[in-house]
């Protein structure tokens, strides 16, 4: 099966997209067909053995629309959207320009028409149109002013009547029928006036002079055009997030070829070329720094505002800005392979898909226009049957036609999805489909892989303990690194890295060897070995320290000199700075949080306590992670799985929503529904919050679209005329129809201002750091509880005390909270590990002042 993208022309409403989708789905050999009204495109999977691309184009053409294979599919030139200036944003801009031009001329002629028809109603008359004898000239002038408006908006008629002939009426059909009915009514009245004038029947002339509908036809088309203009302008803004990324890619790049610095077009840079990037320039392709240092602004890709330092070996990405410095970098990924191109491709893929919540709107869109036509016909017949005059019945029928709006239904979901995924991309969150975007908001449980997700996945030296009087900590670290330098074990590499960072230097080690549980070497004539607790022999002090370090979740290695234990070097996989904050946010949202790890139970629980996780599944094999996810689902939970490694891929695929850390493996990213570019766990919270915001926005849009039609059509049909006297002029109906689509698109645009709560407070990071420092204490110290009285200034109402209570209750280790407004204090029961710094930072985050903390 081949996945293809087609550009579709001629669609104006949800009925159009439903018609195209139905026509293509009927072809044998096509599946997963999705038509996007907002983007005017279609994606599908094609079986080459059964069907050709031309067959798809013919099916769309037969349905009354145009289709062409997108250039990126038909011409694999390697150029990407980042390198093609004829982007979707520019197409939308061209549409906006053309719509604006039509609108301005329509408004001009419509204004002239309104002047001669409306001013006499307020006493401002024109002598050359006064009197029954001049009424035919007055009517003919209205006709002449209306004709340019019809010509300017001829697309409504050509598309609308073509769709009617093809038995697939759409919004254009409704507008065309409404405007045509008004025009025909006016032309009939004009002929009646001419015949009556010839017969000298001036009363008939006067009567029909006040029942011309030329102004209605012109106003219907102009107001619909006005709505289309606002809609086109809003559509152009929905792609801002991605189009801004596209615009950041420079047109040229400087490369070194044949020993000389040369400027070439960015799309001619090849893998292996050496780039030269200076301060203030944007990087054209992905690469790795081979010379120099720099500060790079990566906010375009990651959403992070602070520049990132780059040195030799650091990776750089296309579209990022060189804040300061000068580097040479080797191009590693160009064209469609760059990170930026992949981000845009993922966003494009997501916006081309459909959210499950849109299915009801799709089903209704397929029958909406025929039902409206039937309602308009029934409206006219019923009113004529009950004795109303033909003109009144026709007015109501035209109102029904022009007020009905399938556009709002068709735009409700894709606009919210497009703006939401674009905003997510700016925050460094990539949703692969609209379904993932919707499902993410419905999760009830979060399962986290430990290594690389909660922790950095890179061990560091945390403790150096010396048990020999002739050694210092620095000496012990130097000895340990000198022995471990030839080992490939991650802990050995952490020790060597720590020695180099502390500039201890290394001894010359000889006769390196290893055996189960330890490694050994000879340094300065002495035998040194490093390994597990078996090397501690029966040294009580060392065994006790090993126990303490183990309870803190650290892996301790014993260092021996001539078979005598002289010290301990402990390593640990450090917790990410934002892990505790993210987990607190998930729990505050009412989600169940679990952690999976292959580590032993003691280490796993130590890490879990440090970040506030209550449920831990330790010593789990990679193959069993998916089973844990499935078991959680069987308990009724909708699971979000977050991981980064190859061994997480089955679990990511099994979960309701799989979320991959961006720094993870390609396999994990491939299996995931969502990718976190920044590798930050707080971005998972942002994804959850944004998903909820998008789903709420879609539901608001759908409600408005359904509510508008449910109220507007009966009012236009005159249902309330006999009881309340309510009826709608076709011009008002046309204005309402236009504004309904504008309201839907404008509501979706509010998502551009979405701000995740995890990025609102800078002080929260200091809170996390303080909490992590507290949890490095041994287990037996952590189990003690105490009472603390926190004096607080700034609380004035129950809302204030409630906010303090809620914030303190969320802290790991706090067992009870009692806040008194009268005494201006909070009394808490907590474990000894909850430090004053943590408490103060938590309350300060709420904009209250802590004046004192007393421990009892």
Located regions from the model:
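Membrane-embedded alpha-helical bundles of multi-pass transporters
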Residues: 122-136, 165, 184, 423, ...
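Residue-level signature of catalytic and energy-coupling elements of molecular machines
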Residues: 13, 20, 24, 44, ...
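Flexible metal-binding regulatory segments at protein termini and peripheral loops
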Residues: 1-137, 235, 260, 341, ...
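Conserved ATP-binding TGD loop and adjacent catalytic N/P-domain core of P-type ATPases
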Residues: 2, 18, 525, 553-555, ...
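Actuator/coupling domain of P-type ATPases
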Residues: 64-70, 78-81, 85-87, 140-142, ...
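Hydrophobic alpha-helical transmembrane segments
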Residues: 144-156, 163-166, 180, 203, ...
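P-type ATPase nucleotide-binding
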Residues: 461, 465-589, 601, 613-629
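Conserved cytosolic catalytic loops of P-type ATPases
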Residues: 31-46, 54, 211-214, 243-337, ...
